[in-house]
């Protein structure tokens, strides 16, 4: 996250850190005691998820590590289009209980409205060009913008993609490399998943692109309920 500050240790209890053999690479959001939501482009072989992390160098007493038991990506996702259905639901190999630094974030009850203030968080780069990765997550507030702003800034963003556009028009506050899969929380509701953006991060008129969680709520709830053949919206 660029243009932000170190998150308060208690304001990211649902944020999950993903690690593979090369180290930290993505985030996710705990949606209940057994399930994490992330971006499809964060799928990796043999990764672990750590919950309750603040500093990657200092262990919290209640930190928990889990492995993916099952991973679900939309069966109708166009794999050659990174922006299409960039969402992945992960079942943990065992449940996690709430603690001082761990708590789930529920799915949204309604879609967000343009103009909402949204909160971003992550261990991604805090500098736009030469990437600098912090040990602690950074947080910032940005605005939910009209989809047309992102369609103008990104010709590859098709109108039918179920995405949200969020940032600051003049630039300077944005998610960045390493923030993928983390949450966009608008007016206290979990509305987006960090999916895509410009390089360097934080350019004017090139806000971040987030998968629109609300549109996938039925799919998510179906899979959690055990209907693993559920299909995503087109």
Swiss-Prot record:
Expressed by the venom gland. One of its GO terms (cellular component) is secretory granule. Keywords: Disulfide bond, Glycoprotein, Hydrolase, Protease, Secreted, Serine protease, Toxin. GO terms for biological process: modulation of process of another organism; plasma kallikrein-kinin cascade; proteolysis. InterPro entries: Peptidase_S1_PA, Peptidase_S1_PA_chymotrypsin, Peptidase_S1A, Trypsin_dom, TRYPSIN_HIS, TRYPSIN_SER. Monomer. The active site is at 41 (charge relay system), 86 (charge relay system), 180 (charge relay system). It is found in: Secreted. Belongs to the peptidase S1 family. Snake venom subfamily. This is Bradykinin-releasing enzyme KR-E-1. Disulfide bonds join 7-139, 26-42, 74-232, 118-186, 150-165, 176-201. Pfam families: Trypsin (PF00089). CDD domains: Tryp_SPc (cd00190). Negative results: does not show a thrombin-like activity. One of its GO terms (molecular function) is toxin activity. The keyword Cytoplasm does not apply. Residues 1-225 form the Peptidase S1 domain. Bradykinin-releasing enzyme. Releases bradykinin from bovine HMW kininogen. Has anticoagulant activity. Increases permeability of capillaries by intradermal injection into rabbits. Its EC number is 3.4.21.-. Glycans are attached at residue 20.
